[in-house]
Amino acid sequence: MPSSRLLSCLLSALLLAACGSDSAPEAAQPQADTPPVTSGSAVSDAAASDEADALRQRIAEAAEGAHRSDANKARNAARRPVETLQFFGLRPDMTVVEVWPGGGWYSEVLAPVLRDGGTLVAASYPMDGDVPFRAQMTRDYRARLAEHPEVYGAVKHVPFAPPTYGELGAPESADMVLLSRHFHNFISAGITDQVLQAAHAVLRPGGILAVVQHRAAADAVPEAEQRDGYVRESYVVEKAEQAGFVLGARSEINANPKDTRDHAMGVWALPPSLRACRSVEDEAERDACEETYRAIGESDRMTLRFTKPS
């Protein structure tokens, strides 16, 4: 009968479909490897990170270099040159003016980093200046650099002591001016404004004014700044802004909460000077005095990055 044949056909079709559904799925065909898509910003970020790491390594090698004394290298833990110079934005191709480099602690780090692609300008107190100990410090500094021409041979020198020697270099010729722990000296000499004006003049637009300074309490009286070596952060910011700079960033890299700032000899009571202990005649008492101040460590310091507007 036709209806019986139709029913048989339908049943056969259903059985074939069921068998087909139990068969193994077709194996996926292998595809060619496709490289991950990397955005331009990711590539740029990676390159910047690599560059920062390389610079950090370069500064660290300079800070631990054989040209430095063990005593100066021992102070790296307190003065943190790697972190500080990276915060300021140091690059190996910069022209950096270091104002009153003193014994050359920072010059020892900057010179190797800048030797090949940049320039270090040491703006020292003039050797014919009327402050004998500062003039002698410059002579000693120059002699020390002469001992390692392979490190310091490219360092340039300019005398700087306003108002007689009031320029740090040709206008807009530098990328960074470093003022490390000298604001109290500028205050004592009455040249703070002149120093900042000279820094502004020598910097290119966008250039950096890098400041590290012993930090006074916010409510400290100004008279104490000359005596104790500590300066109010608000004063430094005010003076820099008056000279035309813009505060870009603050850092607590060089902060020391153990420093109470109330030492009889001011900041010089602390390491490395330990001046408060020099007059102690008894050796055991002197050792105890020095141990007390060493436990505090070096001073609490502000670390400020200003820029000259473009």
Positions of predicted regions on the chain:
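Bacterial signal peptide processing site
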Residues: 19-23
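Class I SAM-dependent methyltransferase Rossmann-like catalytic core
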Residues: 54-91
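C-terminal lobe and adjacent flexible extensions of AdoMet/dcAdoMet transferase-like proteins
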Residues: 286-310
